[in-house]
């Protein structure tokens, strides 16, 4: 049973996290690849029975049918299923789909790896997540004894989120979060981007999950770097090398850590939302070889977060400093410690402001698109970046780095 939700090609989950202090956490994690289902020791009808069981679970959750959902489970999983039904009560028109990636049956036990997608009213595309299930044969047939996330849990496994909507936005918020204020801020940020990127088609709707605090955000998305206020995820399918252009965005979402966001001054709150929405808006244009410094440069500039003066001070010895050529490889900012991440964000902002001063915002966006051009290629990421700069802006990487440092 080949997975059907994820088409062939290079599929990855990209995460970018940004904070009011400049500590970010871009990460690239391979998404599970499609594999044929494997069965051992049982006839094919066991596989069919398990597939039917998985479909029953998805339908029961959609309908919030406690009896039907718990009837597919055994042991402690029944209690977790009851809670899931309770905690989806305020997610209107929930739609759930599952597709098996791997099925390994040994005797009366089965291990299942699957992709689950969910959608609530207002979402233009579902969000995908990887699950791992254990099932066992009982006198009543196959039952799920464990259903757990392989990466991030589902929102309703963390808290009873409520869905609210605004034009182009679906916000899931838990108890204790001022959804109205965040929704208003997000709507304003979307309008700002519409004005800043008039030639770009923005996402028809963006899924935003409000985490109450850093602990809840960690439950939803894994490790959260200190200082991160919001982050954006996208699951994308890349095309062939050398361009690695995005062929399809499979899923995308934002997470806002409300406890941190709420403490920021109003201008910084809005800047944070514009920054993360910029990452989301540019998902289709973000090649697999787009330098992390450039991705952050565009988001920092469009959100009005100018750190060019800080970059010059750092280059003069006032603090940690990092060159753009050190920030060309995927994950290069994520791998830095907190102090160095601040330097990386300052350098990225400095680069944006130099480019905009000389070539305008259109020049900055033209450079961004250049990494989708297969004709621009080099033996290393630094060489490719230098060639993209020369081709689009008539500027070398060395010249840009010198200008960022104020030399």
Sequence positions of predicted segments:
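Short solvent-exposed beta->alpha transition segments
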Residues: 37, 41-52, 56-107, 217, ...
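Acidic/histidine-rich, surface-exposed loop or edge segments in extracytoplasmic proteins
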Residues: 33-40, 51-54, 162-179
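Acidic/His/Gly-enriched intrinsically disordered linker/tail segments
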Residues: 237-252, 267-272, 284-407
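Short beta-strand edge/turn micro-motifs at domain boundaries
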Residues: 21, 124-161
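Surface-exposed, charged secondary-structure patches
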Residues: 84-129, 261-262, 274
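C-terminal motif of bacterial Sec signal peptides marking the signal peptidase cleavage site
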Residues: 14-17
